[in-house]
C-alpha cells in the first residue's frame, strides 16, 4: 500500500513540474491553424488590413512570471523574430495562479480547449506545431524555432481587416472585422472563428520569480466575435496591468 501511495505522489509531483526537458516539435493535426495579427492601439480609432499572404506567423507562448525556464525560451523567440515575419503572444498562467497577475480566465480556457496541457514554457507555431520545454531538440532553441517557422500556412488569396472605434466617456469601443478567405481550403464541416486578443504591449512587474521585471505582448483578454466572416460589435476591454498601451489584435482560428 505504501509503495502505491509513493507512486501516486511521484506522478502528481511530476505532472505539476514546469516542462524543461527536450521536446521534439509535435504536429497538432486536430485543432486547426491560427492566423491573423492585424492590430490597432486600443486608444486610437482606425483600421488595419493585410493580405493573407503577408500576415505574420502567430507564435503563442505559454509562460509565467515565476518560470525561469521561460526566460530562455522568450529570448530565443526574440532572436528568431529579427529574421522572421512573426508575432509573439504571451499567455500567462491564470487558473490556480497566485503569483502571476498578467493572465486571464478566457486565455487559460482557450489554451486548455485547444492544447490541453498548461505547461510553461510551451510554444505553438500557427496553431499547428507545438514545442514544449526549454532544452532544444537540435543544436539550439533558435535553430528549432527557425525551422518550425518554415512550416508556413498556405492561406490562399484574401484579406483580414480590423476596424476600431475607440471608447469615449459616453460610449463603448466598437470593433468591426472582415475576413476574405477561400473556405475550400478547410474541411467541409469546419468553421473559422474570429476573436479580438487584447494585448498589453509592455507590463512592469518586478516581483516575478524569474527576475525579468518587464513583460512584452501579454494577452490580457480574449473577446469572441463568432464564426461570421464579417461583423461589428461593441467591446469592453480589460484593464491594463499598468500604463495605457493595450492593443487589439484580430485573430482567426
Label the model's feature ranges:
Residues 100-118, 122-125, 129, 136-253:
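Short, conserved sequence motifs used for protein processing/export or organelle targeting and
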Residues 60-66, 131-136:
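Second-shell loop/turn segments in exported
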Residues 1-50, 54-59, 67-68, 76:
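Secretory targeting signatures
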Amino acid at each position: 500500500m505504501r509503495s502505491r501511495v509513493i507512486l501516486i505522489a511521484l506522478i502528481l509531483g511530476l505532472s505539476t513540474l514546469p516542462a524543461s526537458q527536450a521536446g521534439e516539435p509535435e504536429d497538432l493535426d486536430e485543432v486547426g491553424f491560427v492566423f491573423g495579427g492585424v492590430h490597432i492601439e486600443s486608444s486610437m480609432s482606425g483600421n488595419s488590413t493585410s493580405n493573407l499572404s503577408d500576415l505574420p506567423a502567430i507564435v503563442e507562448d505559454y509562460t509565467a512570471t515565476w518560470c525561469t525556464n521561460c526566460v530562455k525560451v522568450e529570448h530565443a523567440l526574440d532572436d528568431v523574430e529579427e529574421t522572421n515575419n512573426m508575432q509573439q503572444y504571451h499567455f500567462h498562467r491564470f487558473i490556480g495562479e497566485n503569483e502571476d497577475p498578467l493572465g486571464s480566465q478566457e486565455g487559460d480556457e482557450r489554451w486548455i480547449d485547444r492544447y490541453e496541457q498548461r505547461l510553461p514554457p510551451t510554444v505553438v507555431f500557427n496553431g499547428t506545431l507545438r514545442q514544449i520545454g526549454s532544452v532544444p531538440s537540435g543544436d539550439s532553441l533558435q535553430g528549432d524555432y527557425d525551422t518550425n517557422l518554415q512550416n508556413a500556412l498556405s492561406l490562399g488569396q484574401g484579406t483580414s481587416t480590423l476596424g476600431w472605434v475607440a471608447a469615449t466617456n459616453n460610449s463603448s469601443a466598437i470593433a468591426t472585422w472582415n475576413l476574405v478567405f477561400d473556405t475550400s481550403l478547410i474541411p467541409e464541416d469546419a468553421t473559422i472563428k474570429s476573436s479580438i486578443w487584447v494585448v498589453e504591449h509592455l507590463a512592469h512587474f518586478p516581483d516575478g520569480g524569474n527576475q525579468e521585471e518587464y513583460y512584452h505582448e501579454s494577452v490580457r483578454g480574449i473577446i469572441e466575435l463568432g464564426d461570421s466572416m464579417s461583423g461589428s460589435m461593441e467591446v469592453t476591454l480589460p484593464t491594463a496591468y499598468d500604463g495605457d498601451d493595450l492593443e487589439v489584435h484580430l485573430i482567426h482560428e
